[in-house]
């Protein structure tokens, strides 16, 4: 098991370790309460710099016209991506040890809420240079291991994957914590909130929820499911170990999910097959033209062409899998005259 001493280090021990933690679950599952307790414990026990970014605290004021207003799905997605861009600006400042610049294109209200979020957690402070506002990193942000905990529903796997991509881009640690709270409990808690969500919204999220699945998605291997908020304190050691493991094993930029690699291989193979097919067709066509002057040769080539067409699939099996020829044609003389033997082709 990793220890805090392995992670904390000093300035001479190399670059500071940084990570992103996705905290997901249904609305009113207890994520915000859990995140605050986790941040306090890690600051006290591990000496880390922790930034909790609660999406509900940063995003609503940017678009809410009324207490229960909600943006269209497409607008919501754009706002989430914009918030990830803000996080990237902060991470670039931390990694490069420089001031945090202001995005040229931003939703002003959401940007201000994001800045307030970081200031309140002692990660940045305001400064002015040459009459331009900028934000400087605090000593806490640059001198300690840093973990950003993103608190949101993240009910779609694709939402969490966007955070993973950000971790991969900057070689950060990445992990996921899923609070698996019963739907009935979430509905009861939601009903007690001043600005409660419609119950049907939570029911819909419950049906659409895609839980972390490390067996299916290799990039989700650093994931931990906490059965209910009541068990959060009992899982504290597991949570700490998960975060330590993530910091010690940052996502490599060159790594990608296995599905994408398989897709790339298929595309590559398809391109090779297409080019090979074009080459074979060109060779057959040219040979036919050259044989037209000789009737006997032309008749033989006509038969050969028919044979190639009839055994097209078998030829590709040889190219792809180096298999034995399984010809539908009984005329094996074609194999002999072409000097193709009924055995696996040499790979040399």
UniProtKB/Swiss-Prot annotation:
Pfam families, per the entry: KTI12 (PF08433)
SUPFAM superfamilies hit by this protein: P-loop containing nucleoside triphosphate hydrolases
Catalytic activity as recorded in UniProt: L-seryl-tRNA(Sec) + ATP = O-phospho-L-seryl-tRNA(Sec) + ADP
Biological process annotations from GO: translation
Residue sites binding ATP per the record: 25-32
Cysteines paired by S-S bonds: none
Entry EC number(s): 2.7.1.164
Pathway connected to this protein: Aminoacyl-tRNA biosynthesis; selenocysteinyl-tRNA(Sec) biosynthesis; selenocysteinyl-tRNA(Sec) from L-seryl-tRNA(Sec) (archaeal/eukaryal route): step 1/2
Keywords: ATP-binding, Kinase, Magnesium, Nucleotide-binding, Protein biosynthesis, Transferase
Requisite cofactors: Mg(2+)
GO molecular function terms attached to this record: ATP binding; kinase activity; L-seryl-tRNA(Sec) kinase activity; tRNA binding
Function: Specifically phosphorylates seryl-tRNA(Sec) to O-phosphoseryl-tRNA(Sec), an activated intermediate for selenocysteine biosynthesis.
Family that this chain belongs to: Belongs to the L-seryl-tRNA(Sec) kinase family.
Protein name stated in the entry: L-seryl-tRNA(Sec) kinase
Organism whose genome encodes this protein: Homo sapiens (Human)
